[in-house]
Amino acid sequence: MKLTILGCFSATPRKDANPTAQVLEINNHLFLIDCGEGTQVELRRNKIKFARIRHIFISHLHGDHFFGLVGLISTFRLLTRETELHIHCPKGLKEVITLQMKLADSWTNYPLYFHELTSSDSELIFEDGKVEVWTIPLDHRVYTNGFLFKEKEGERHLHMPSVIEANIDMAYYNKLKQGCDVLNKDGVLIDHLKVTLPPNPPKSYAFCSDTAYKEDIVPIIKNVDVLYHESTFLEKNANLAPKTKHSTAKEAALIAKMANVKTLILGHFSTRYDNLNEFKREAETIFKPVELASDGKFFDFD
């Protein structure tokens, strides 16, 4: 599981930073999460192949989280993309993007699907044989979801000395890895648990931005490997958080602690702050380990 931060600051422009966007690579999927201005430039800068992006997840309809989307959709057209693109987003985004394309008389030459979200409950919005994606209902000034990405349990591993000793034909190796008992060459039924090892623990990642402090999300993100939680403010400006529906670094750490996550990443920093290490120090009074997002930063959680 790998995470690339393309942008991690809040809405106000800053010459050395971009608004929210990140790419999660999990089990051969490349998921784009939010798409603020400058996203496609950062994709190029970080050498991420556009064609591998087939699913985009938009948390909410504030511009710093989706103003880069129509440009990216247009670039896909210029690159003669043929692969379908799925956008998981709040209701209303399809109307916005369609109007922009209509006024420009610039339509896609590839299948474009909008999966618009309206539920206030956590729901499964994507699933295949390897990965699930769930919404995380957040508390912001407009309808907002975070996203929980979860690997499904993978195949078991062969313990080759035991497999050879059990006299099992190679043709049955895949069945063993899938958790099936098989007949050996002598016609004896072999328990797969005796010749295989458990699969690698499935990885999980939760993206929570933008949101006020909300303990209701704790059961949804319980025990995740990595939590990205917005921390727009430091505690010295905590009075600004409730009225803007954002969180402080301390509040993000409290959520991480209650949810028993393994690693907390802080992001969505207000541009009023120059020293981001203050966010880390504040959060570490509650929870460790804490990482700070920064544009172009790469996390490898394998």
Where are these regions (language model features)?
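Metal-dependent catalytic neighborhoods of phosphoester/phosphodiester hydrolases
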Residues: 69-76, 274-282
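Divalent metal-coordination and catalytic microenvironments
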Residues: 3, 34, 43, 60, ...
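General small-molecule cofactor/ligand-binding pocket signal
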Residues: 4, 88, 113-118, 134-136, ...
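Conserved beta-strand hairpin/beta-sheet module of binuclear metal-dependent hydrolase folds
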Residues: 1-46, 84, 147-149, 156, ...
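Active-site neighborhood of divalent metal-dependent phosphoester bond hydrolases
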Residues: 81-85, 91-118
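Metal-dependent phosphodiesterase/nuclease catalytic metal-binding core
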Residues: 118-266, 277-286, 302
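Active-site neighborhood of phospho(di)ester-bond hydrolases with catalytic His/Asp-centered motifs
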Residues: 33-36, 53-61, 90, 205-211, ...
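Active-site metal-binding motif and surrounding structural segment of the metallo-beta-lactamase
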Residues: 38-88, 116-118
